[in-house]
Amino acid sequence: MAAAPSGKTWIDVQKKTFTGWANNYLKERILKIEDLATSLEDGVLLINLLEIISSKKILKYNKAPKIRMQKIENNNMAVNFIKSEGLKLVGIGAEDIVDSQLKLILGLIWTLILRYQIQMSESDNSPKAALLEWVRKQVAPYKVVVNNFTDSWCDGRVLSALTDSLKPGVREMSTLTGDAVQDIDRSMDIALEEYEIPKIMDANDMNSLPDELSVITYVSYFRDYALNKEKRDADALAALEKKRRETSDASKVEVYGPGVEGGFVNKSADFHIKAVNYYGEPLANGGEGFTVSVVGADGVEVPCKLVDNKNGIYDASYTATVPQDYTVVVQLDDVHCKDSPYNVKIDGSDAQHSNAYGPGLEGGKVGVPAAFKIQGRNKDGETVTQGGDDFTVKVQSPEGPVDAQIKDNGDGSYDVEYKPTKGGDHTVEVFLRGEPLAQGPTEVKILNSDSQNSYCDGPGFEKAQAKRPTEFTIHSVGADNKPCAAGGDPFQVSISGPHPVNVGITDNDDGTYTVAYTPEQPGDYEIQVTLNDEAIKDIPKSIHIKPAADPEKSYAEGPGLDGGECFQPSKFKIHAVDPDGVHRTDGGDGFVVTIEGPAPVDPVMVDNGDGTYDVEFEPKEAGDYVINLTLDGDNVNGFPKTVTVKPAPSAEHSYAEGEGLVKVFDNAPAEFTIFAVDTKGVARTDGGDPFEVAINGPDGLVVDAKVTDNNDGTYGVVYDAPVEGNYNVNVTLRGNPIKNMPIDVKCIEGANGEDSSFGSFTFTVAAKNKKGEVKTYGGDKFEVSITGPAEEITLDAIDNQDGTYTAAYSLVGNGRFSTGVKLNGKHIEGSPFKQVLGNPGKKNPEVKSFTTTRTAN
């Protein structure tokens, strides 16, 4: 036996061993004795130890004693409990425990060990012998000698043999090192690992100072393990059977469903875990430790939801967003379930192989939904047959983004629709999970117009003539039947017929398009107008192209081709005739008129639209002029033609003379002569000038004048003035009065030689002032009035400026007359005066009595 460590006694060994024994129980309440002598002082740890080893409760003890009395009370309760268990305590009381009497405390603990660990009383020696005999039988095969519980254990061989005997192979004797302490310590470690025997004493203590009670206490654990092994095995077998019956076996668990077979992106991949026990029986309860993980080939883990249905079925689901291979791991308590891990292919469309197509990528119209289709294809180029892919569509118009709607058809195809609001070039691009399709963006022409609503009008749409330019207008109309206000639509126009026709289209940028063409040959033609290969309204349109006018058959006639005069419009008419001699009935011919002469002339030609053309020109100088008429560059029959232009009569230089412009009588024709003089002041010697005579008489009377062209530059004028009075005579040339016009002419009653009487009278009045004195100066108002049926009368009132006033008058006719004379508004003495002229019985019944008045001053 090795020497005991310096200063260490059996008390120290027992203290450590018994402390370890007690702490092995106290640990279940997370309690611990630090020093056996002092830790039991308050009675709390001792009471807890007693409750644990006896499986009984000690009630109403002080759990936090502060004073000695409370500690003694607790320990009294502990001592009394030990006695109540039938144990006899000698020489120890509560005060001894409070006062830390170690030897007495060791005796107390040994009493507890005997009862609850070794199950024997202190006076009974047979259990000790029985324990020794049990050890001998256990280690007999190992050829080791054990005679006691002291020095037989010093070299560690007995302990090593005992350790291996409970489970052969765990402590091979051949592995002993010969170092007793090391071998003992290793055996204690194995006993702890394999049999859960607490290491309540040190290897040094067993080697150098083997305290019998300590060794017995420690070795008793081995016998307990051996005696309880059968029960433990039975319990373990029962527990195993229970586990096999009531819990799942990872190797038998069934995992099934599309989520472990294959799936599609963005669609829930579901599968189920069926709890199955060791015997292959399905379990109907939940709560087991299944775990699921899903990791893609790119190393990214996909969240997986696991739901315990509490009926033995667990529902798992995950949604992959990237098409690739995934590893699905299903474990039960960190053990792979049957067939786990699973290699699952999640299919989905690939941006490099998917494509978009349809009319919405080829063109569209404002206000009309434009549709196209997306077809998903996987990385192998195979058509995808399920929906759920994350396709997005971006539509950009000249004015900004346009909303696009995507419908997932569930079969790998997607219907896309967008509704343009403005015409012009649009860009449409399709993305898959943010990546553009390989086909890239598509440029789409969006039209303002709708082919079914757009239409044409204009002359060139109804009729045309060979070799004549013509045109018509395309009116673009939207799908809403409203006229378009913007251009840019690709209308196509063609005209087919016997001969090719070149067509030009001008976009007016206002929703209209001008179509111009010049057919070279006549015949029946067809107009085609299309928009994106669709015919517009009323198309095709048949049109007959008439023959062009023939310069050999066409002709001109009119006075302007015979001659003219300066400053006067000369006119003639062109008649368009086709090669068959048929007069054309519409316009548009290429006639051109040129005139050359002494002065420039700009002829004006008007297309009457009926096959005739009116030409008018006004020469400014006299002389010979050459008129040329061409049709498409060829001279018309009879041209060129020379015409003579005479000097024009001048209103400024022309004049009129004659008695009819001086004095006329109501009973005789009045005559005068117009003398035509040209602009150079030369008297004209021929006629034809458009002189006009206008004569207006009293009271709005209009008198007709007869003008006779003497064809020698003079024009005779005769008119009758039917009543007396003033007449206004005006002679004009082309609206302009001739020299000294207009002129006033007085018409008087003409005398009848058989019936008329004549009287001439004169008298003088001498004026006096208020004093009756004759005045010697004039200035008074002298008024003379004659009333009667005069056929002709002249009357003058004269202030002689010497205080006398003279009245002079003459009368023609028959009848009674009255003459009134006033000075300053008052009749002179005897006024009015009565007189008779001729024979009143012969008075002209058509002459009525009237008053004539004259005033001086």
From Swiss-Prot:
Keyword Iron found: no
Instruction: Give the InterPro entries listed for this entry.
Output: Actinin_actin-bd_CS, CH_dom, CH_dom_sf, Filamin, Filamin/ABP280_repeat-like, Filamin/ABP280_rpt, Ig-like_fold, Ig_E-set
> Which residues lie within the region annotated Actin-binding?
1-250
Q: Which residues form the Filamin repeats?
A: 245-346, 347-446, 447-545, 546-645, 646-747, 763-837
Region of interest: Regulatory site: 229-246
Q: Which GO terms describe its biological process?
A: actin crosslink formation; actin cytoskeleton organization; cell migration; cell motility; chemotaxis to cAMP; hyperosmotic response; lamellipodium assembly; phagocytosis
User: Which residues does the UniProt record annotate as the domain Calponin-homology (CH)?
Assistant: 12-117, 125-227
User: Segment Disordered: which positions?
Assistant: 832-857
Molecular function (Gene Ontology), one example: mitogen-activated protein kinase binding
| Keywords, ordered alphabetically | Actin-binding, Repeat
Q: Membrane-spanning residues where?
A: none
Q: Name one GO cellular component term.
A: plasma membrane
PTM sites of type Blocked amino end (Met): 1
Q: PROSITE patterns, alphabetically?
A: ACTININ_1, ACTININ_2, CH, FILAMIN_REPEAT
Disulfide-bonded cysteines:
none
Comment text on domains = The rod domain contains six 100-residue motifs that appear to have a cross-beta conformation.
Its assembly, as annotated, is: Homodimer.
As for what it does, the entry says: F-actin cross-linking protein.
* Name assigned to this protein: Gelation factor
Species the sequence originates in: Dictyostelium discoideum (Social amoeba)
Q: What is the lineage of its organism?
A: Eukaryota, Amoebozoa, Evosea, Eumycetozoa, Dictyostelia
Gene encoding it? abpC
